[in-house]
Swiss-Prot record:
Its main location: other. The lineage of its organism: Eukaryota, Fungi, Dikarya, Ascomycota, Saccharomycotina. PROSITE patterns: PROTEIN_KINASE_ATP, PROTEIN_KINASE_DOM, PROTEIN_KINASE_ST. This is Probable serine/threonine-protein kinase KCC4. It comes from Saccharomyces cerevisiae (strain ATCC 204508 / S288c) (Baker's yeast). The active site is at D152. The gene is KCC4.
Amino acid sequence: MTVANTETHSAAKPSSTIGPWKLGETLGFGSTGKVQLAQHERTGHRTAVKVISKSIFNNNGNHSNDDSVLPYNIEREIVIMKLLSHPNVLSLYDVWETNNNLYLILEYAEKGELFNLLVDHGPLPEREAINCFRQIIIGISYCHALGIVHRDLKPENLLLDSFYNIKIADFGMAALQTDADLLETSCGSPHYAAPEIVSGLPYEGFASDVWSCGVILFALLTGRLPFDEENGNVRDLLLKVQKGQFEMPNDTEISRDAQDLIGKILVVDPRQRIKIRDILSHPLLKKYQTIKDSKSIKDLPRENTYLYPLADSNNHTSASIDDSILQNLVVLWHGRHADDIVSKLKENGTNKEKILYALLYRFKLDSVRGSNKKNRNKIKKTKKNKRSSTLSSSSSLLLNNRSIQSTPRRRTSKRHSREFSSSRKRSSFLLSSNPTDSSPIPLRSSKRITHINVASANTQATPSGVPNPHKRNSKKRSSKRLSYMPNTKRSSLTSKSLSNFTNLIDDDDWEYIEKDAKRTSSNFATLIDEIFEPEKFELAKREKAELQRKVQEAKRQSVNAQKINEDEFGSEVSDGMKELKKINDKVSSPLINYEFSQQELLQDIDTLLTNRYQLSSYTRPISRLDPGLTPVTETLPNNLKEKTALLQDTEKKIIETIRRSKFLGSLLNVRGGLSPGKSELAPIEESPIVSTTPLIYNDRMEPRRISDVEVPHFTRKSKHFTTANNRRSVLSLYAKDSIKDLNEFLIKEDPDLPPQGSTDNESRSEDPEIAESITDSRNIQYDEDDSKDGDNVNNDNILSDFPQGVGISQEYDMKDKNPNQSPISKSAEPTLVVKLPSLSSFQGKNASGLGLYQREPSKVTLPSLTSNNSSVGENIEDGAEKGTESEKIAASLSDDDLKEDNDKKDNDTVNAPTTVKKPPNSVLLKKFSKGKILELEIHAKIPEKRLYEGLHKLLEGWKQYGLKNLVFNITNMIITGKLVNDSILFLRSTLFEIMVLPNGDGRSLIKFNKKTGSTKTLTKLATEIQIILQKEGVLDK
């Protein structure tokens, strides 16, 4: 193509528009350039623009003096792509070029590549896979019938439109196949290339395309490739392809028909390979074939169309050659003599002239068929205001395009610049050898086409009927209209001949050149204008289809959005119900017939009085004193407002009762030990709440509230509740001075008691409550003063702790174990004597304050407890202020350490303690001098490995009850974890470690270590584990 000088514009910034197309976002990159989304400025139609750099042409051996001239093979390739008009072949709409790039305006496939569909969804169902495969075979059959082979078929080059129809794209490797010549270029992808291409042998392109289709079918049905190497070794892959070595899927993966078709396609010998038309008649494709598919197959051109382009529908050879198509071939071959082309068309065998003739002839038939179908039921009316322009010129003007130079070029270019570039309409040409019997080729959009009357080649003079070439060549209104579609805008070239159009190409003042965009070449542009005309009707049809697609897409999105909203609403409701159920299950109190909120205490009292339910002793009451429960707040019913005065009074009494129960719960046995002469207290039986009458208090003898006495508190487990219950009671210690003077207080209470040194071991061992209370009080003082005066503390004076119990089912009653026991006494300075509160109001059978949580004493006998008699040291500093004692719980020691501690105490005491062996199934506790790590031990009679596995499963099942961060060290048999403070047991957060150690003779030992946190929490955990082991019968008796 001849290009005018545009150096002043070549360095400019690349334009965002090419002709009428406005370039947009980049869709992807290829080997020859990038692909951008484009939109028509007037119609809004979207296309894909493939940008090809001209530097590729120069690198491929194009050494023309004019760089803007495209190679002939590129021009032919573009014409072939345009002439391939099939629903399953990607359409080429237009071609534009600049100084540096070539722009191919292609059909836009919205759903992308078939490869991405397989990656996202995996193998397709057989019906969908066969529908896609059938469209691929039909499109390739169309190309093969016209002598075109693709040679690069793969899922990446198969695109999908908005309706998931196949569009075969990327004809960059395509070639014209003839019988005389075999192809030799090795091209394509290794996974899809045929064995003959991989081997480097001359091959027939039709058979190689069939092999690629077989690989694609395998991928559609299985989601993988038949020839592949996991390590990426291309050499091994090519060897597999050469041998045709692959694994056929079994019947469970694909059907027998699919196995048969794949076996017939993937044959190494191309001569034995199934033909493309035979695939369409295979039972697998016939299984899912529809009427529409049958029609598409029927509309395919003859299989040997490229061999006999001059044959008619009955394969009878026709000697006549269409002159208009012949002239187009002359234009395409850049002035090649027509006789030479005619001889090529009539000779035997195949050649490129026959293939191009067949393509143009097929294109012409499709255009005529489409035009006749649109105008079948229309009545043509004569329009007086419409004109018909015909151009007459001699064939000499066609053959010598630059022979007419009668007027200055400047004037001619200006006139045609206004007529062409300003309207941005492209010209249409149809070359005809006979002005009377030649007919225009109507394009698919039925745009108006002006045909040129070409006279005899021997006539050199201009006919008298031809006007001045620089004036408009229009006839009168009475001239007969030759366009097929009425009411279409005129878009024809108003020059006298092709010679004048060629001269305009060389003009520098063209507006196309000013906008840095031009057509490819003069002769090539002539052909492109004829077959690429973007007709108005075609664009309107596309706009209508696009609008319908958008409306359907909007409806589909609306339905999907509504469905998603409904699903989200349903999931939210379901999640809310599950969360509510979890909350209800987590609440330990029964929820039967609770009509109102559980937050307010008045509602609880009214419900208890109304229903009179026998509550289980294993449940915890719900009240405002319990911080772990926060139910939903609701308003009180109207009938309860009348009882406000009575309920307020009752509320105070209930609260005082609860406080007194916590204040006095652990002092019952202490009081019994201090008064050995009094009668035994009968055990309190489990009974429902039967009354809320005011309790009788002795104001002179008992403090009414805990806040009345400023004392430190030490929380421990009450003996009046079952071990399954988590209630705690508070033992009041009257200042740290009372710790020293407790023995003197006991002596004053009963002066006949013997001194501490004479206390018999049996009496001391039967009632551990007093010793435990004193020990706990002593521990509080020691823990607080440990950091300050640790050097002054004598560890020998600290009493040894006693076991807290053997299990949750073993309980202490409130009887005096021995009425004649001797209390501990100690000489000290006299201090103020404070009377402990009496329990007269709770000794009755129907007492309402504590009866709810009591149960009958367990029949399991308690093990005898070992105690050591030692004096309480007085060397603790008195500088600590009153009320600052903390609840730090001492660490524990093993049995051997306890004996060593007792031996050390023997040096300072008169009477050596008598040690009684503890039961092996009890939890052992000891206290270090300054340590803060608690150790508990449980003995079992099974091997340590079996015991560790049982603990592993047990603790895993307790994760939902507050056990977190469990770490299992199988090698060392160590389990570490944490009990969080928001657990269902409402215990303090504690970090613990459990070790399973061998104990000889197939026995084992569980050792609990408290790292940080609460001793009470660790003891609770050890006790619960001990109960489970006792039920399983694995405790060491």
